[in-house]
Regions:
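Membrane-embedded alpha-helical segments of multi-pass membrane proteins
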Residues: 2-13, 35, 47-64, 112-120, ...
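Alpha-helical transmembrane segments of multi-pass inner-membrane proteins
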Residues: 9-17, 86-90, 94, 116-124, ...
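N-terminal hydrophobic segments of proteins, predominantly signal-anchor/transmembrane helices
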Residues: 17-44, 50-116
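Membrane-interface junctions at the ends of membrane-embedded or membrane-associated helices
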Residues: 65-73, 126-138, 204-212, 252, ...
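A membrane-periplasm/extracellular boundary helix in multi-pass inner-membrane enzymes
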Residues: 151, 157-160, 226-229, 246-284, ...
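Membrane-interface loop/short-helix elements at transmembrane-helix boundaries
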Residues: 173-186, 269-308, 313-329
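A conserved mid-to-late transmembrane alpha helix and its immediate loop/hinge
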Residues: 223, 314-350, 376-378
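Transmembrane alpha-helices of multi-pass inner-membrane enzymes
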Residues: 255-259, 369-377, 383-406
Length: 406
């Protein structure tokens, strides 16, 4: 456990450096997302470090924009789609309050402002990218956060293995420095999946240049925590992402991937093998398909257009991001959500057609595979709605938008 003075000290230093240059604040956000973003102290309960830094970054960014007389929102292909998703979220909250389907207006607006925070993170990262050096700075920041997070995972499970009742020791979520257990292991694993795919794509794109070793190390170190999270959706998403990378961009690595698929399972502990055997359609129907059916039955009779309102129930109620979006924001919100995801993939594809630098291509390829992986993981999880994986997704997507703007 870290002392409280260190927690506050890191937050203050990140805030101070932000006023010098916004990229320092974005670096602080990327690392805070990766390590332990939620703290419980005597002064503040459940304080998220990146939220504190986000306020400082936004204020510094706002002042910089006013000083330079630049438009607040940088132009990206996703601006209108982001505006549409923010609009549908706001409408769902307002109508949920008016119709009485939203238990608390505070919870509704909290969820909407968190969405706005993600949009601002996306725009600030995209706006800060002015050169290849900026891309490398922010990319390394994101990867350092993921490496630190992976190290925590290794400490919690792999290095402190216990055979008591056949279960490993530790909470293994790399989420809270102190206080009760935080997020589920599958949310932690989904965060690592996206970063692992970015690291793998960047390593393959840079190979055989010396710079390929760092992203390769990132990808390698994240695999063990992902596997030992026992998250079937995260493991399936990782496999889909790897096959997306090899099938679309790096076919020369496909034989190596296929060989690894044969060798690695034989090396896994029996406990993990049993968990992986649960990756089946029958299991999915029993454990997850009910969420879709429940969302339709509970939403259509009440308010099919805008749903019950953001935050009316926890994510565990429907167990996947699509049913949750339908129930919370209705058909209109689901359309906005899917349109935004399609826009992300389209932007990434356009960017790949415009850039030739192997470093830039590696990042965009990894983000493309990560987006596909999150779409698949969303069938039985909430990677694009849960805080930590959604933050890393929009950080990297903002970097792709910045590359698109170069």
């Amino acid at each position: 456990m870290l002392p409280n003075w260190l927690i506050y000290g890191v937050a203050v230093i990140c805030g101070f450096l932000t006023w010098r240059d916004v990229k320092w604040g974005l670096t602080g956000i990327a690392i805070a997302i990766g390590i332990s973003p939620e703290y419980r102290t005597e002064f503040a309960k459940d304080l998220r470090l990146e939220d504190f830094v986000m306020v400082a970054v936004f204020l510094a960014w706002l002042i910089q924009k006013a000083r330079d007389r630049e438009p607040l929102i940088p132009f990206t292909p996703l601006n209108r789609l982001w505006g549409f998703w923010l609009f549908t979220g706001a409408i769902s909250v307002l109508l949920g309050i008016a119709l009485g389907t939203l238990p608390s207006w505070k919870i509704g607006f909290f969820h909407w402002f968190k969405r706005l925070e993600l949009a601002l993170l996306f725009w600030m990262v995209a706006d800060r990218v002015r050169s290849l050096a900026d891309v490398k700075w922010l990319a390394v920041s994101g990867m350092v956060g993921a490496l630190l997070s992976s190290y925590i995972g290794w400490q919690q499970k792999w290095l402190k293995w216990s055979d008591t009742n056949g279960e490993p020791s530790g909470n293994y979520n790399a989420y809270k420095v102190s206080g009760p257990q935080g997020e589920k292991p599958n949310v932690y694993a989904q965060y690592l999946v996206f970063n692992a795919l970015v690291g793998l794509a960047l390593a393959w794109s840079l190979h055989p240049l010396p710079g390929s070793w760092f992203p390769a190390a990132l990808a390698g170190l994240t695999v063990v925590p992902i596997l030992f999270s026992f998250s079937r959706s995260a493991i399936a998403a990782l496999l889909v992402g790897i096959f997306s990378l090899t099938g679309v961009f790096h076919r020369r690595w496909l034989p190596l991937v296929l060989i690894a698929m044969v060798i690695v399972p034989s090396m896994l502990p029996s406990l993990l093998k049993e968990r992986l055997e649960g990756l089946s359609w029958e299991r999915f129907k029993v454990e997850r398909l009910g969420g879709y059916i429940a969302a339709v039955k509970e939403t259509l009779p009440v308010n099919p257009l805008t749903g019950r309102g953001l935050g009316f129930a926890g994510f565990n109620r429907y167990e996947n991001q699509y049913a949750n979006t339908l129930a919370r924001e209705g058909i209109l919100g689901l359309i906005a959500f899917l349109a935004l995801l399609w826009g992300v993939l389209k932007m990434q594809n356009e960017t790949l057609q415009m850039v030739g630098d192997p470093y830039l291509r590696g990042i965009v390829q990894g983000c493309f595979a990560g987006t596909i992986a999150y779409c698949i993981a969303g069938l039985s999880g909430v990677p694009l709605l849960a805080i930590r994986p959604s933050e890393t997704f929009w950080f990297w997507t903002g970097l792709c938008a910045g590359i698109w703007r170069l």
